[in-house]
Design a protein with these regions (language model features):
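N-terminal beta-loop-helix "entrance" segment that forms/cooperates
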Residues: 184
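Cofactor-pocket helix-loop regions in the catalytic cores of large enzyme subunits
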Residues: 1-181, 196, 200-216
Length: 216
């Protein structure tokens, strides 16, 4: 989680809900999303299913299962085409942007529409709505992660958020709803014994990089 649940449901101007049916799987979050909609928050649902919240959505993109990466690339293609990226955030807080531009340049709305079985204009509208909203979190669940490309799907959504500067701010971020109680918290706090060694290596590597950067 990059943001607390209360923050993303009470402070968001738009919510992008991807591969998640919180009213059934996470009812407290589902209730909070409905409350956010009542106060005027926009909702984009990205899900092949006709979930309850899709009836309240401004846009419902019914992706073909397993095409989340292409969808995210298409969103980023539109953001760049429309000049809606956050250049300051990208320059100061990201790396590899030119490589990402090269990857997504061929994922036009028309191409993504064919891959994902969605309407190209709806994809454009969703991308522009997401980019222009001041505070817009992405909330996702197992509908993204339970694929062979689950990791890539999450990374692609993270790239989306960074492209428009929606990380590290109130009412934004990339936020997973998981399958068991506090499984995300355990991972975020490096308490998962399955990955403890890998996490330690990453922390050490980051420490070394920061030390070199600041001449320590």
């Amino acid at each position: 989680m990059t943001n607390p649940i209360e923050d993303i449901t009470k402070n968001a101007d738009l919510i992008m809900l991807v591969g998640s049916n919180p009213e059934e799987a996470h009812p407290v979050v589902g209730m909070q999303i409905r409350q956010a909609i009542k106060r005027g928050c926009k909702l984009i649902v990205v899900d092949p299913r006709d979930i309850g919240l899709a009836k309240k959505a401004d846009i419902h993109l019914k992706l073909k299962p397993g095409t989340n990466v292409a969808f995210a690339n298409g969103i980023m293609n539109v953001i760049l085409s429309e000049g809606l990226q956050d250049d300051k955030f990208i320059a100061e807080r990201t790396e590899g942007f030119e490589e990402l531009k090269e990857i997504v340049k061929d994922y036009t709305p028309e191409k993504v529409a064919e891959i994902c079985h969605i309407d190209a204009d709806d994809l454009r509208k969703a991308a522009i709505m997401y980019a222009k909203a001041d505070r817009a979190p992405i909330i996702y669940c197992l509908g993204v992660t339970e694929h062979s490309t689950g990791t890539e799907g999450v990374m692609s959504m993270s790239n989306m958020a960074m492209m428009v500067g929606k990380l590290g701010r109130e009412g934004c971020g990339v936020n997973p709803l998981r399958g068991q109680n506090n499984v995300q918290g355990a991972c975020d706090m490096a308490l998962s014994r399955m990955y403890i060694q890998d996490i330690r290596r990453l922390l050490i590597l980051q420490f070394v990089r920061n030390s070199r950067k600041h001449g320590v």
